[in-house]
UniProtKB/Swiss-Prot annotation:
Keyword field contains ATP-binding: yes
Xref: InterPro entries: Cyt_trans-like, PPAT, Rossmann-like_a/b/a_fold
Species lineage: Bacteria, Pseudomonadati, Pseudomonadota, Gammaproteobacteria, Enterobacterales
GO terms for biological process, alphabetical: coenzyme A biosynthetic process
Keywords linked to the UniProt accession: ATP-binding, Coenzyme A biosynthesis, Cytoplasm, Magnesium, Nucleotide-binding, Nucleotidyltransferase, Transferase
Protein name: Phosphopantetheine adenylyltransferase
This protein's record includes keyword rRNA processing: no
GO molecular function: ATP binding; pantetheine-phosphate adenylyltransferase activity
Localization, UniProt: Cytoplasm
Needed co-factor(s): Mg(2+)
Function of the protein: Reversibly transfers an adenylyl group from ATP to 4'-phosphopantetheine, yielding dephospho-CoA (dPCoA) and pyrophosphate.
Subunit structure comment from the entry: Homohexamer.
Species this chain originates from: Buchnera aphidicola subsp. Schizaphis graminum (strain Sg)
Length: 165
């Protein structure tokens, strides 16, 4: 039986930090579903359709990415629907770990077969976050080291299209 893992996130936008986790996970799991959250309480710069498209662009070269999907609702319920019992989570800091441990416990209560596997960020990308990258882009800083080329161009264009206050 193939091991299907889900890597959830907002991916606004997908960064080299995310790709580090995804690439390493492809060496362990047969199939990976990248699940992009459509959390209405989180303010995103890219809409869900754009985030799915950009994530597909950034991961097209990875053969065992089963699909890139958007989702609403509980992650544990998505895992059940997709017949997956593994969540992949990236951890950069002790603060991330503290949050992720609590989330894993809640997901386990909802779906007892669901396990969370934590990937420590590689040191080269451990400081990258989508929020930091967007902040740098907003003020026309150099974001090339943090994003694949296609994502870099999309983010620059997005900030040009948004009127600055």
């Amino acid at each position: 039986m193939k091991k299907i893992a889900i890597y959830p996130g907002t991916f606004d936008p997908i960064t080299y930090g995310h790709l580090d986790v995804i690439t390493r996970a492809t060496k362990i799991f047969d199939n990976i579903i990248i699940a992009i959250s459509n959390n209405v309480h989180k303010k995103t710069i890219f809409n869900l359709k754009e985030r799915i498209k950009l994530t597909k662009l950034a991961t097209f070269h990875l053969k065992n990415i089963k699909k890139v999907i958007g989702f609403n609702g509980l992650l544990a319920n998505l895992a059940k629907r997709e017949k997956s019992n593994i969540l992949i989570r990236g951890v950069r800091t002790i603060f991330d770990f503290d949050y992720e441990i609590k989330l894993a416990a809640i997901n386990k209560q909802i779906y007892p077969d669901l396990d969370s596997i934590f990937f420590l960020s590689s040191k080269e990308v451990s400081f990258i976050s989508s929020s930091f990258v967007k902040e740098i882009a907003k003020y026309q800083g150099n974001i090339k080291p943090y994003l694949p080329k296609e994502i870099h161009f999309a983010l620059i264009k997005k900030f040009k299209d948004i009127p600055q206050k």
